[in-house]
């Protein structure tokens, strides 16, 4: 077992991380009534409070990774707001990924999402320049440990987001996104690259209730929280 400060094949493990989303947090989110007048800090308030605190704690890292990868800080921050919290990380690491080593009818282990900013192992590996590489169980655990390190997690997500922008818009200034580009590139983080750009553009035009509108729901949520994320990042 690697300790913080050690190095594995993929990264140096840094112990300076935001507090993890715990079972207690998840139970307070799922089981405590969302009654603000009782000040229980449960329900959606528990989840959103954690998300905001995570971004605030890692503000300098988020802004630095965005600058290094020539993407807007609020774009990276909005993906983070969507991703952090939810299922405690040990569920994927200790239950889901081990089961996927043997249960052939489930998703492959490399499609397991790990890290506070949830990201599939295969996506992280592609950013590191090893697309399609098969990892041993030991290597999967090492990459998971890296994704559970905030600095690595933020950087690899920022690098992947730049790829998602350029996938549809190869000739643009990636530091300045229109609302459409913001929504579509953000939705690519969640939906991947299998679907053509025209489907996402049509999804943006679709009225509520149409099934294809779901293709851009992720990016729409990002756009709704954009002003709040900017404030958290001091932008």
Task: Annotate each predicted stretch with a short phrase.
Residues 6-235:
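Catalytic glycan-binding domains that act on GlcNAc-containing polysaccharides
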């Amino acid at each position: 077992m690697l300790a913080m400060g050690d190095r594995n094949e993929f990264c140096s493990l840094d112990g300076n991380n935001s507090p993890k989303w715990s079972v207690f947090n998840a139970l307070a989110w799922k089981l405590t009534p969302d009654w603000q007048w009782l000040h229980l800090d449960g329900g959606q308030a528990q989840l959103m409070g954690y998300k905001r605190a995570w971004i605030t704690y890692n503000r300098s890292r988020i802004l630095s990774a965005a600058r290094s990868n020539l993407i807007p800080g609020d774009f990276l921050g909005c993906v983070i707001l969507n991703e952090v919290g939810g299922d405690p990380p040990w569920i994927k690491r200790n239950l889901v990924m081990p089961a996927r080593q043997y249960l052939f009818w489930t998703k492959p282990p490399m499609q397991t999402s790990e890290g506070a900013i949830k990201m599939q192992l295969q996506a992280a590996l592609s950013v590191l320049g090893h697309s399609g590489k098969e990892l041993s169980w030991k290597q999967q655990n090492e990459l998971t440990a890296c994704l559970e390190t905030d600095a690595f997690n933020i950087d690899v997500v920022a690098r992947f987001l730049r790829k998602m922008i350029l996938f549809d818009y190869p000739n643009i200034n990636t530091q300045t996104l229109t609302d459409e580009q913001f929504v579509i590139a953000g939705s690519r983080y969640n939906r991947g690259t299998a679907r053509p750009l025209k489907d996402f553009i049509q999804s943006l035009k679709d009225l509520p209730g149409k099934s294809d509108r779901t293709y851009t729901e992720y990016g729409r949520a990002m756009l709704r929280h954009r002003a709040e994320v900017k404030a958290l990042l001091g932008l």
